[in-house]
UniProtKB/Swiss-Prot annotation:
HAMAP family registered for this protein in UniProt: DAP_epimerase
NCBIfam families: DapF
Subcellular location: Cytoplasm
Function recorded in the entry: Catalyzes the stereoinversion of LL-2,6-diaminopimelate (L,L-DAP) to meso-diaminopimelate (meso-DAP), a precursor of L-lysine and an essential component of the bacterial peptidoglycan.
Gene name of the encoded protein: dapF
Protein name: Diaminopimelate epimerase
Keyword Isomerase in record: yes
Length: 286
């Protein structure tokens, strides 16, 4: 039986989007998702995202496999792509502003398609306690801020944030000088992270600008990571690398695939991410 899909990308972070609303069982197995994400033998993508019918307070549900077939709790670039996928499925017109309540394995996430086609996402609150990441780098009820971690042949100062998925953020002088193909797997599989981790290597460019490279858990080196950009802004504030302006902290996060605008509303603790999501092509899996 053939299966239709749409390919979308958000800053080069690309996904296969599948309309799964007519049944509860996901239309691809983890092994099939891994095969179709392969850029040599399959279609090529950083993950597969399934759209399911909503339940309770949600309009829709999102479920996702990473490129290695593992389950992803959430994906910032992915949920922007999903919002544009829904926008098209509903037959919306360009210029409409539409908000969706989407149930994810990280909780309820609310993306809003803007009049200019960009998508702003209420990413919710960061989780900062070691047990919430999870990590063994601090006591369960303590934050992990500028904690030393030995990876490879050097010690790194890391700050850990969960955006529904685990992130390990480290600030460096020059992100371009790092060999992520070597460092990324060493961080991802470090025993301090029992569920593995995403890792962000960040260079501070100015009072409101950060440059970030990312190694994603289950996907490897990617061109962008929305939850990682959010975690990076939080880590920059917690470590004093950036100072909030009043009750807001915000920054442009430069990624290899382009820029994301990230804002942290300190009174509510909610993070907001704004960026593009574009359809690439449609196809059919045999």
């Amino acid at each position: 039986m053939s299966l239709s899909f749409q390919k979308y990308q958000g800053l080069g972070n690309d996904f296969l989007l599948i309309d799964n609303r007519h049944q509860e069982e996901l239309l691809l197995t983890p092994e099939q998702a891994q095969f179709w994400c392969d850029r040599h033998f399959g279609v090529g993508a950083d993950g597969v995202i399934f759209l399911l019918r909503g339940t309770g307070e949600s309009d829709y549900r999102m479920r996702m496999y990473n490129a290695d077939g593992s389950v992803a709790q959430m994906c910032g670039n992915g949920i922007r792509c999903l919002a544009k996928f829904i926008f098209a499925l509903e037959g919306r017109s360009a210029g409409e502003i539409v908000r969706y309540r989407i149930d994810t394995l990280a909780g309820l996430i609310v993306p809003e398609v803007q009049a200019d086609g960009q998508v702003t996402v209420d990413m919710g609150k960061p989780r900062l306690l070691a047990q919430q990441i999870p990590t063994t780098l601090a006591a369960a009820d303590q934050k992990v801020v500028d904690v030393p971690l030995t990876v490879g042949d050097r010690q790194w100062l890391v700050t850990c944030v969960s955006m529904g998925n685990p992130h390990c953020v480290t600030f460096v002088e020059d992100v371009a000088a790092l060999d992520l193909a070597v460092l990324g797997p060493q961080f991802e599989h470090h025993p301090a992270f029992p569920q593995r981790t995403n890792t962000e290597f960040v260079q501070v460019l100015g009072s409101d600008r950060l440059r970030m490279r990312v190694w994603e858990r289950g996907a490897g080196m990617t061109l962008a990571c929305g939850t990682g950009a959010c975690a990076t802004l939080v880590a920059a504030v917690l470590t004093g690398c950036l100072s909030p302006g009043g009750d807001q902290a915000q920054a442009t996060v430069e990624l290899p695939g382009g820029d994301l605008q990230i804002r942290w509303d300190l009174p509510s603790q909610h993070l907001y991410m704004t960026g593009p999501a574009l359809a690439v092509f449609s196809g059919t899996l045999p």
